[in-house]
Amino acid sequence: MVNAILMACILAGIFVGMFNEVDGIQILSKSKLEKCEKTSDSGNLNCSTKIVLNLAVPSGSSGGEASIVAEIVEVEDNSSSNMQTVRIPPVITVNKSAAYALYDLTYIRDVPYKPQEYHVTTRKCEHDAGPDIVQICERLRDEKGNVLEQTQPICCPCGPQRRMPSSCGDIFDKMIKGKANTAHCLRFPGDWFHVFGIGQRSLGFSVRVELKTGTRVSEVIIGPENRTATANDNFLKVNLIGDFGGYTSIPSFEDFYLVIPREAAEAGQPGSLGANYSMWMLLERVRFTLDGLECNKIGVGYEAFNTQPNFCSSPYWSCLHNQLWNFRESDINRIDRHQLPLYGLEGRFERINQHPNAGPHSFSIGVTETLNTNLMIELRADDIEYVFQRSPGKIINIAIPTFEALTQFGVAAVIIKNTGEVEASYSLTFDCSKGVAFVEEQFFIIKPKAVTTRSFKLYPTKDQAAKYICTAILKDSQFSEVDRAECQFSTTATVLDNGTQVTNPFQIPETQPKGFFDSIRILWTKIINGLVDFITGDTCRNKCSSFFDFSCHIQYVCLSWMVMFGLLLALFPITCLLLWLLHQKGLFDPCYDWWEDHFDLDHHRRLLPSRADVVNRHHHHHKHRHHHNHHRRTHQRHKHHHGQDDDVLQKMMLERDHSDSHYYHQLHRVHKDSKQKQRRRAKHGIVLPRDVHVERQRKQRLRES
């Protein structure tokens, strides 16, 4: 270590040649050092001498490659402090590709490019009306044939101040054809767009280092996904330390959504987006409604459109502003005025999706600023000592669960074990086949005989179900490969989500029959449906607001209403007839008798004499008998028995009163029975001569009086 302190990283005679006219390439430091390898606790070291170069390699701003050539001609020997010329000078060539920023994408859902409101002028607008009435605004159905209630039309009355001004017609049109109205509906014809959430960004580029010594050529390629490499002859080793920050920050789009046009594909699979980057747009997240419940936002659905307040008095196309086509038209107008677009990618960014292995659903932009990469190159030489520990390792297992492409990201869990006897550092590279975004190499330290797990996030660039092959490469502290393992994982196809919109593409319903037999079938179906509806009355219940809406019921010929209205009109005469029949059967005779017994006073006066009349009759009868007995008996006998006769007379009067009451009671019963018989004879139409005679006498007395 003393030699390491004495040697102050001195290298001389460095000649640097520049190609492609790229400025700013710098050699940051140069040195010689002796690296000693320790493989066990025995203390034995395996040492070798290296020449170390620390370079700052820029990226080309034009998208081409920037190169440097460094030829080492002289080195300083520590033992003699003299400059010595290298007999065969090595030539180092470094090429760095253009840098790009690669962004993680997460599929959110699909949205329509231009939602449209349709209206139909009609006179029979109803929510469940067919295409013959509301035409394009007929309710839609899903793949299973179920009616989608949220797609039903909204009916608005006619008038000049309505959502769609229309004439109401004259009074004759209203009476014959019905009142005019308009049907409004939301539909999604035309293009659809994928919506992606934008996640973290990663910087991408590649550095190619070539070392030529005489006729021998060593070459390595490194980048953020593979930051260390060793040539096959172990003469050259390269380590990518990192990048120097620029003055301009790389844009972050975490508050934006990327919208990409959805192209047609076979068998319902999402199509490739191709290179139609002119339609790609970046829009703020606040402009979207992912649940479709907000008006005037991208992704608006049926519920938001149908439930907007004051629908019929709101302007036409309300709730459908700020859609994708509005932003696209705004960009086109700016481009026509020779201005930069505000939402589109073309014109704002360079080298869109030109990174290696670009998939149909990946997103990258070119970095226009020159970025410097810190690169360390090691060559064989003799210099200072540097001791490091090296230990073998092994990849035990790799596990990658199946996941949905684009919507989710995969996680590769790699289990590694230090199989040596010393603690050492390792690096792990995870390289996948085409179609998976690259992942950066990881560095870590493992204790002897210990096991650790390293995780990598995998982002496929395709939305179809596919299988991928990945290779995990374990490197030791000398960047030499110590183990390699392959694995496979699968992804399921991205499930496209249209939100609250109809899942199947919108098509205008067919209203015309396709042939003669189809016409017969449609006619027969209409007849059957009309007959069923005529009997059940579903149309009347849905279209007529009240029971007494006569014009509506007459217009739609409602059978149930006609039956109910006829029953209502026939209720009064039927009730009267029923009461008359019950009267004829004598059901109400007890009621009549009860009324006569309690409330018919004139009848009682005619049949029952008063108490005074009865007493007077008794006294008159007594006087008559007493006068008759006065002439037959002597005065003495009458005088002797006068007191006894009075007592007997009083007793006889009471008995006579009782017998008279019984008589009149029997007379009342006979009169009542006669009235009942008279009613029965009248019911059956029987008239007796005696009844006729009595009736004639009653009429004669009335005329005389």
Swiss-Prot record:
Its main location: endoplasmic reticulum. Residues 617-642, 668-684 have a biased composition (Basic residues). Residues 1-24 form the signal peptide. It comes from the Eukaryota. GO terms for molecular function: lipid binding. Residues 25-561 are extracellular. GO terms for cellular component: endoplasmic reticulum; endoplasmic reticulum membrane; plasma membrane. Residues 583-705 are cytoplasmic. Keywords: Cell membrane, Disulfide bond, Endoplasmic reticulum, Fertilization, Glycoprotein, Lipid-binding, Membrane, Signal, Transmembrane, Transmembrane helix. The chain crosses the membrane at residues 562-582. Pfam families: HAP2-GCS1. Expressed only in mature pollen, in the two sperm cells. Residues 617-646, 668-705 are annotated as: Disordered. It is a single-pass membrane protein; Single-pass type I membrane protein. Residues 690-705 have a biased composition (Basic and acidic residues). Glycans are attached at residues 46, 78, 95, 226, 276, 498. GO terms for biological process: double fertilization forming a zygote and endosperm; fusion of sperm to egg plasma membrane involved in double fertilization forming a zygote and endosperm; plasma membrane fusion; pollen sperm cell differentiation; pollen tube guidance. It is found in: Endoplasmic reticulum membrane; Cell membrane. Disulfide bonds join 36-47, 125-155, 137-185, 156-312, 158-168, 295-319, 432-470. Disruption phenotype: Defective in pollen tube guidance. Prevents gamete interaction and fertilization, resulting in male sterility. InterPro entries: HAP2/GCS1, HAP2/GCS1_dom. Required for male fertility. Plays a role in pollen tube guidance and successful gamete attachment. Essential for the fusion of gametes during double fertilization, where one male gamete fuses with the egg to produce a zygote, and another male gamete fuses with the central cell to produce the endosperm. Mediates the fusion of cell membranes. Not required for pollen tube outgrowth. HAP2/GCS1 family members mediate membrane fusion between gametes in a broad range of eukaryotes, ranging from algae and higher plants to protozoans and cnidaria, suggesting they are derived from an ancestral gamete fusogen. They function similar to viral fusogens, by inserting part of their extracellular domain into the lipid bilayer of an adjoining cell. The N-terminal domain (62-541)and the C-terminal domain (583-705) are both required for functional gamete fusion. A positive charge, and not a conserved primary amino acid sequence, is required for a functional C-terminal domain. The N-terminal domain may be involved in interactions with another membrane-bound protein on female gametes, while positively charged C-terminus may function through electrostatic interactions with the sperm plasma membrane. This is Protein HAPLESS 2. It comes from Arabidopsis thaliana (Mouse-ear cress). The gene is HAP2.
